Amino acid sequence: MLRSVWVYSLGLAVLLQQSGREQCWEHSQCRDLSSEENILECIQACNSDLTAESPIFPGNGHLQPPSEADRNYAKSHFRSTALGRRTNGSVGSSKQAGENAALSILFAALAPPQAEEEMEESESSQQQRREDKRSYSMEHFRWGKPVGRKRRPVKVYPNGVEEESAEAYPTEMRRDLMSDLDYPLLEEVEEELGGENEVLNLQEKKDGSYKMHHFRWSRPPKDKRYGGFMKSWDERSQKPLLTLFKNVIIKDGHQKKGQ
């Protein structure tokens, strides 16, 4: 009992200090502070006056003063009724509920300035994020303004003027420089391509279709199949067999002479 009264008194003192003047004592609820219910009613009255003095912004419903129905519901909900007095088990819970209500009212009285600052900071941060997002979308896509001037690639001229920039020359002089360049003649290019074409034609005549015989999916020539072991008797060389017969005949002749 004493603990709850001290909690209520502390909350009332904080509210009076926050208000800055003795307007809370003018209420009829604050004249009699002998019971917990009167202290709770006084704290709620002071809290309602403080919230009524704070500016009301759209979208900040928690900063608006509570309605009369909400006040009555809070008073009837947290008040220790006759049912709580009759039941021994609910007495402690009603006291704890009263203390929690006083603490919640105390925190609510202290919260509005901080909540207002947090709301302002959150609104400023959200606005900054929206601006950053908009600037990114405007600069990132084609219809937005580019970040900076695009750098043009450096042009290199083969006639020794690469040290000087191309912007130093007007358009006519640049055309003259390009006309003075020694490009290979078309006849020389055709001759080089003609030599390559002759080599390709010889390869095609030698191995048949170049595309069919050059890649893996084409059949290899007969002389290269299986390493040359699958040749016919006519295609194989007859020299080893003839050399063998010759050696046998010579050996037989030497043996006959020795006999």
Swiss-Prot record:
Record-annotated disulphide pairs: C24-C46, C30-C42
PTM comment: Specific enzymatic cleavages at paired basic residues yield the different active peptides.
Modified residues (Valine amide): V147
Record-stated family: Belongs to the POMC family.
Subcellular location as annotated: Secreted
Any one Gene Ontology BP term: neuropeptide signaling pathway
Name of the protein described by the UniProt record: Pro-opiomelanocortin
Listed GO MF terms: hormone activity
Main location: secreted
Residues with the Pyrrolidone carboxylic acid modification: Q23
Origin: domain of life: Eukaryota
Annotated spans, Disordered: 113-142
